[in-house]
Amino acid sequence: MSSGAVLTSQEYITHHLSNLKVGEGFWAVHLDSLGWSVFLGLVFLTIFRSVAKKATSGVPGKLQCAVEMVVGFVDDSVKSTFHGKNALIAPLSLTIFVWILLMNSMDWVPVDLLPHLIHWVTGMPLGDIYMKPVPTADPNITFGLALGVFILIIYYSIKVKGVGGFMKELTTQPFGHWSLYPVNFILETVTMLARPLSLALRLFGNLYAGELIFLLIATIGVFQLPVHFLWAAFHLLVIPLQAFIFMMLTIVYLSLAHEDH
Amino acid sequence: MDINMTLVGQLIAFVVFVIFCMKYVWPPIIGAIEERQATIADGLAASDRAAKDLELAQEKATAQLKEAKVQAASIVDAAKKHEAKIVEETAGKAQAEKERILATGHAEIETERNRAREELRKEVAILAVAGAEKILERSIDGAAHSDILDKLVAEL
């Protein structure tokens, strides 16, 4: 409990799940989610770019080894699933995997650490400090990523199959008879929309739930330490797994978009 | 869930990051990895080749060694034969030389003996004449009686 006895558990959790927001309604921006997201993206690109600049095919340094392990892992995943030629898929998968991994990792930061740091540095009262540091526990972030993937799915579907081919794919299956084409279209549209929705909601749901449990654990007093440790250890599985699933499904969806029936 | 401009901001960041990654991050790293993989593959292939070469060289060396042994044995054989031949030849020559020397010796001895005998015979003739002169106590005309003397000499 951070803000003293005046807060009930519900108020404490609600407070911690509120974003640092500027603007109103649709035009609002979550500064904490977007800020951490961009910061972590820049961390990823800075590290990888510094390795890329000095990349040698000779004996690699330790950082290059680590980066090459990640790149090799992503490259293997892409090559095992996507068989076409596309210069975008692999770097896209790398960005998704590492970026989401870093964003998910913010789940390990103790829930009260950042608000207290801000309180300590700026002197703002804790009740006014809103800081939700896990970007992937914000649906805006996960839907932003999923929307990007969705646009790519549509783009490559049309690019590879043409508008006609894409429409044909949406209408002529699973039922072959012309009278059922509208039904097909509805089914296929739902399938198509389910892809980005499931991508975004799966990631968001896992991380939001994880964050919520961390907050619940933070309200139980002194026993929170071992419980917190257990839950954090469990996230050793959840965090990379969710990043991997998002990347893998992106590759699968794009690979489906490239398949011409 | 309130969906707002954060989503658009995230989408823009996503696009920018992916483009940056595609242009400046992925190609150099994957290039270095693939280049190294090629180098390692080449190195492994080269070591395989070298091992094969070594095996071949060893086989060749063994074969050459065997051949050399056979050759050496045949050379020794030939040398032994040659030696035996030389010994035989030399022995033959020595025998011939010995016989030749013996023959010469015999011939010389024979000549010497004949000569000595001739001299002896002449001396005996002279002694016989001298004895006859003494017996007859008169001088015998050597010229008148030379035919008798010659006959005597021939009889000796």
UniProtKB/Swiss-Prot annotation, chain A:
Pfam families for this protein: ATP-synt_A
PROSITE patterns per the UniProt record, alphabetical: ATPASE_A
Membrane topology: Multi-pass membrane protein
Keyword match Transport: yes
TM stretches of this protein: 28-48, 89-109, 140-160, 203-223, 229-249
Any one Gene Ontology molecular-function term assigned to this protein's record: proton-transporting ATP synthase activity, rotational mechanism
InterPro entries: ATP_syn_F0_a_bact/chloroplast, ATP_synth_F0_asu, ATP_synth_F0_asu_AS, F0_ATP_A_sf
A GO BP entry: proton motive force-driven plasma membrane ATP synthesis
Localization annotation: Cell inner membrane
Keyword terms: ATP synthesis, Cell inner membrane, Cell membrane, CF(0), Hydrogen ion transport, Ion transport, Membrane, Transmembrane, Transmembrane helix, Transport
GO cellular component annotations of the record: plasma membrane; proton-transporting ATP synthase complex
SUBUNIT field: F-type ATPases have 2 components, CF(1) - the catalytic core - and CF(0) - the membrane proton channel. CF(1) has five subunits: alpha(3), beta(3), gamma(1), delta(1), epsilon(1). CF(0) has three main subunits: a(1), b(2) and c(9-12). The alpha and beta chains form an alternating ring which encloses part of the gamma chain. CF(1) is attached to CF(0) by a central stalk formed by the gamma and epsilon chains, while a peripheral stalk is formed by the delta and b chains.
Stated role: Key component of the proton channel; it plays a direct role in the translocation of protons across the membrane.
Family named by the database record: Belongs to the ATPase A chain family.
NCBIfam families in UniProt: ATP_synt_6_or_A, PRK05815.1-1
Record protein name field: ATP synthase subunit a
Annotated organism of origin: Colwellia psychrerythraea (strain 34H / ATCC BAA-681)
Originating gene: atpB
